[in-house]
């Protein structure tokens, strides 16, 4: 909505939910532990804080409700009357008044009990005062159950109301039920209003939007109105009356020519005269709908006189059919133009126009001489205007040709090219290509030269066949030399690429650190021309075998009792401690120990027994969360 967004009103909880939400928030967001041996001012402050916190929560929520709901005296009269019809203005104001009184009562209760708590001389008395304060607040809210439920229903209905801007350009449809109002709005706009062959299908206001002359227009579909006194009209009809009374719109009064709506033309004219005071200062158009069934010319003279009288009074009558879409666009155009003119006329009568006109200055140049200077209109424009007046047959488009020719049609856009030489339209090579003249790069005798070249090739082959054997052998040797030279060039290119790969800027591994495989070494030597057969006893093969232990383990010697203390003992093999194995020097050992301590910090902080301790403690103890919370069992709050 331009000014009113009723969809943003916060949800109004029920009285029970209201109490539960507030008390739960108090329990969660205030301290919960107090002991009787604490100083008395600390105990008082503990319970005062709970009372004030609860009071503030109630105050904020109730204030939010009061501020979100629209005040009937501050909003547009259209919405004020619409809410009065839908929700009863007195009931609505009474509910908001009750909420406001409840808010003040909660504030007064909190103030009184905080004053009494200042004189509490023990933990028990302060606690009882706190319980009494929270209990009285909850009782006050509990008594507002009906008001809260009513306001929640109003909120839900308000959020479903259509988005109507009372101040923008509007087309308003009205008339008897089932005369074709909803069908018209479905044709003109993208609204999807339900259309059924019975009366009062539309029970509330519906809105669609349409563009005309680069402006945004809203089309409002109203429920049907019956011809009886205002006091007897129901809520559905009063919505249409409210829209007619307050929206500055162009009114489209829809009349059913076929009388299939169940009401004759005289009854429809009677309704028109009944609600005519609502059409004052509004552009009005009479829409004669369902003309595909019966037209005005086919009516009786008495019925035709109805429309003639309306036209005599200055109301345009337009025949329409939503089935064949006849007259629909005409009605929209006529209504929009009349409303635009009416709005301009209204603004010109106001005081703001004079303020704007005083700021404008129209500069007119002085006349230089008596020579006439008529506007110049090219001859082509004049000729085109004449052709348009004659209404000569239109030029056939490619789409029309495609429909005529069917499968024989081929899209040819080159026939429309405007070239100096029309014979160049279908040239395969264009005259200009990317800024260059293509003819400059083409030899006209190229095909002739190609034929001569092919002839020369054939003659050379014939010449080779007619050569003596000695010359042919020399030619073959020359051919082999060329093949070898080609292989050498390719080898050089590979070497260059390998050299480029070696010349990278990344980290390099020294040659001595690289592990050389025996097979790779033998392949490389063979490629250089070295015979690598029967090399099992060569130095590189023996060294490779020595690198891994091939000797058998020494047999364990028989244990002999010690003959003397002084006998020689062999020194046991020394073993590196585990905490320093794999570490280079003392500096690295210190760094490893520091990292180990950091890794153990989190485990120690969580009180884990070790790395394998994955125990998860019970986050929801059963003795606190099991069982039902019935009335009188909520002491822990």
UniProtKB/Swiss-Prot annotation:
The modification Phosphoserine is found at residues 122, 559. GO terms for cellular component: cytoplasm; nucleolus; nucleus; perinuclear region of cytoplasm. Transmembrane segments: none annotated. Residues 169-340 form the OBG-type G domain. GO terms for molecular function: GTP binding; GTPase activity; preribosome binding; RNA binding. GTP binds at residues 175-182, 221-225, 289-292. The keyword GTP-binding applies. Residues 563-574 have a biased composition (Low complexity). GO terms for biological process: maturation of LSU-rRNA from tricistronic rRNA transcript (SSU-rRNA, 5.8S rRNA, LSU-rRNA); negative regulation of cell migration; negative regulation of cell population proliferation; negative regulation of cell-cell adhesion; negative regulation of DNA replication; negative regulation of G2/M transition of mitotic cell cycle; negative regulation of protein ubiquitination; protein stabilization. InterPro entries: G_OBG, GTP-bd, NOG1, NOG1_N, NOG1_Rossman_fold_dom, NOG_C, P-loop_NTPase. It is found in: Nucleus, Nucleolus. Residues 542-555, 589-607, 622-637 have a biased composition (Basic residues). The modification N-acetylalanine is found at residue 2. PANTHER family: NUCLEOLAR GTP-BINDING PROTEIN 1. Associates with pre-60S ribosomal particles. Interacts with MINAS-60 (product of an alternative open reading frame of RBM10). Involved in the biogenesis of the 60S ribosomal subunit. Acts as TP53 repressor, preventing TP53 stabilization and cell cycle arrest. Belongs to the TRAFAC class OBG-HflX-like GTPase superfamily. OBG GTPase family. NOG subfamily. This is GTP-binding protein 4.
